[in-house]
Design a protein with these regions (language model features):
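SAM-dependent transferase fold signal centered on methyltransferase-like domains
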Residues: 1-671
Length: 671
């Protein structure tokens, strides 16, 4: 084929064929290439944006009303009629006025905390890859990795440095070159993290990752709803993060199952579903990379706090019980479930941060692989014996490990740790769990996040609250699961309540440790046994007597107060009884930010959301308590027995026998 004088485009069939002519005078290169109007076509471009002229706007002959509409809106990048713009952090997200996609502004704290944790995780992970992240408004910091491999390999690195000096300083030169690699916010980093948000809804969280977290290679925002996926795409263009963020319209579990290969795994997986994350946990523990980060939210707190223990077991493999420590127990239930599912694939978890705030819980865990470490998992889980009378609890480990020289022997634990009835009040025990009985925070990691947030307070809108919550987390006793509540101890024996400083001082004076808990305002987390706590309360009751004649002999209060204390409590206030977070007046427990601030209504699969929770609440309020007292009102309801043909009251029946109120096909009584 002769191609002399013929352009490659013509030879490829994209231009005029031999013998054909094309007038290009006054025609742009795009038009000549077939991307604009064809010959003899005209297109008015006066007042038309370049996007429209390039074929991304209306075609020739089409019209589009742009009066009062911004160019971005006309191009599909701005809000459409009826839509609003939600601004949070550095993101500006388009939001349908009809609330078709789930959005809850109260969870700004959740998203801020996630960005802070991800930033610190990226700092330490990318430091191993020779990349230093840059956070606006933050001073340069020395990075110390939290990985076990680096801690164990310090001596090896020092040996390599010494060897490098003798070989011409090769190691130092390579490290100097690596120090020049930086990753800034909003820039794509080839050595960076791959992030997945499995249930993205409007895409706000993913867009904030792209705009606020440095060191990212790719962010995948997925949602099963086609409307949500379309909105995510529009929001991606609206925030100019198309170079970092990609949209998927897939089932979250299938998307993660397809990423189980070592080279396809995600460094960070964020799951924030409506309700329980249980259906996604199995796929998540497989799709996260070695040492990767899982960020999980649970909003089904009614189930996890003890209202439906059987439902909790079906979802998480653990029975929840009603107790005052239910919020920390919920954290330990989800950690138990994650570790159990990871163990199936010879993997295990390392909790970095676990918080219970507002109406949900949020956990951040690293997932690692190791068959030997997985064998320890049984000894990390425990059953909970909870007294229904006085609230005393005891933990029973599921497994036991003993050291035999260089080897470890694993065996079943022995128990139970309690008798048939409570030794303090004589009541029975409830059995809950199993739960995660190891520390739920990595204090070293939390301290780094706290330092970064407090040193750059303008970065997040909820920085003060993050600082307060994380400060309390660092003050908690990490090796003490669960807690008591001071007002519950007083309520059990029907006496007035000592101040928190007095009670904490009494525990410290008795020779035990004590701390608060971020999960409950009046929590007492201590390694003191329940017997010591009740002795302290008995001593307090002697100073503030209770009228014994009003107590039943079978009540927990009577039995507890009938025993003389063996520990003489001292309630003199100590300086170390007041934690630093309390002295500094940090925002530890935030008041309700707005009316009806809890979880929003569930999104419908076909688009839109269900009725507002406030409307449902008004509709069903007092449904069980307000009984109908006027029997004449019962005539408004059909008789169920008449419908079945079994009513024997006839005309004297207080319910209606009107055939119109019956279901179709339900005949009347036969004589």
């Amino acid at each position: 084929m002769e191609t002399e004088g013929v352009s490659p485009d013509s030879a490829a069939g994209r231009g005029p064929r031999p013998g054909e002519t094309m007038e290009t005078e006054g025609v742009s290169p795009d038009s000549a290439a077939g991307r604009g109007p064809r010959p003899r076509e005209t297109m008015e471009t006066e007042g038309v944006s370049p996007d429209s002229a390039a074929g991304r706007g209306p075609r020739p002959g089409e019209t589009m009303e742009t009066e009062g509409v911004s160019p971005d809106s006309a191009a599909g990048r701005g809000p459409r009629p009826g839509e609003s713009v939600v601004k949070e952090g550095k993101a500006s997200v388009l939001f349908p006025g009809a609330n078709e996609v789930f959005y809850n502004p109260v969870q700004e704290f959740n998203r801020d905390l996630t960005c802070a944790v991800m930033t610190e995780f990226a700092r330490e992970t990318l430091a191993q890859r020779g990349v230093r992240i840059i956070v606006p408004g933050e001073k340069d910091r020395v990075v110390v990795s939290l990985t076990e491999e680096e801690k164990n390999g310090k001596e090896t690195e020092q040996a390599e440095e010494e060897r490098g000096e003798t070989e011409g300083g090769t190691v130092q030169e390579e490290r100097k070159q690596a120090e020049f690699k930086t990753a800034a916010v909003g820039e794509r980093c080839e050595e960076g993290l791959c992030v997945l948000e499995g249930l993205a809804a409007s895409g706000l969280r993913s867009i904030r990752f792209a705009l606020e977290v440095p060191g990212l290679k790719r962010v995948t925002a997925n949602d099963f709803s086609a409307k949500a996926a379309d909105l995510i795409t529009r929001n991606t263009h609206h925030n100019n993060v198309t170079h970092l963020l990609e949209t998927q319209n897939r089932d979250a579990s299938m998307l993660m199952y397809e990423a189980r290969g070592k080279n396809a795994r995600y460094d960070v997986i964020d799951l924030d579903p409506y309700g329980s994350p249980a259906p996604f946990l199995d796929a998540a523990v497989q799709a996260v990379s070695e040492g990767g980060l899982l960020c999980i939210t649970c909003t089904d707190m009614a189930v996890m706090a003890g209202n439906s223990g059987e439902t909790c077991y079906s979802k998480y493999g653990s029975i929840s019980i009603k107790s005052r420590y239910c919020h920390e127990m919920a954290l330990r239930i989800i950690l138990h479930s994650l570790d159990q599912r990871a163990n199936v694939y010879q993997r295990y978890i390392q909790p970095l941060l676990s918080v219970s705030v507002d109406f949900y819980i949020r956990v951040f865990v690293r997932v690692r692989t190791g068959q030997a470490t997985v064998k320890n998992s049984a000894s990390k889980q425990a059953l909970v014996y909870n007294c229904v009378g006085c609230g005393a609890f005891h933990l029973q480990r599921m497994g036991k490990k003993t050291s035999q020289g260089k080897n470890m022997k694993y065996s079943a634990a022995t128990g139970p740790p309690v008798g048939e009835s409570c030794s303090h009040c004589g009541q029975r025990h409830q059995l809950g769990g199993p739960i995660w009985a190891e520390p739920i925070h990595d204090v070293e990691f939390v301290q780094k996040v706290l330092t970064a947030v407090s040193g750059n307070p303008s970065r997040f809108g909820t920085s003060k609250r993050i600082e307060g919550v994380l400060s309390m987390v660092t003050e908690e006793l990490q090796d003490v699961p669960l807690y008591y509540v001071l007002d519950q101890l007083s309520s059990t024996i029907h006496c007035n309540t000592p101040s928190m400083l007095q009670f904490r001082s009494a525990v410290l004076n008795a020779g035990y440790r004590v701390s608060l808990s971020h999960a409950c305002k009046n929590a007492v987390k201590t390694d003191a046994p329940a017997a010591v706590l009740w002795d302290i309360m008995r001593c307090w009751e002697k100073k503030n007597p209770v009228r014994r004649e009003r107590l039943s002999e079978t009540s927990p209060a009577f039995r507890i107060l009938s025993t003389e204390p063996t520990v003489q409590a001292c309630f003199d206030v100590r300086d170390d009884a007041n934690p630093q977070s309390r002295k500094r007046h940090l925002t530890r427990f935030q008041e309700n930010p707005q009316a009806n601030w809890g979880p929003k209504a569930r999104a419908k699969s076909g688009g839109g959301i269900s009725s507002e929770l406030e409307d449902k609440r008004k509709k069903f309020q007092g449904k069980r308590k307000s009984q109908i007292t006027d029997s004449s009102q019962l005539k408004n309801f059909p008789c169920k027995k008449f419908r079945k043909g079994t009513c024997t009251h006839g005309d004297k029946c207080c319910y209606s026998h009107d055939a119109e109120q019956l279901e179709p096909g339900a005949g009347a009584q036969t004589p």
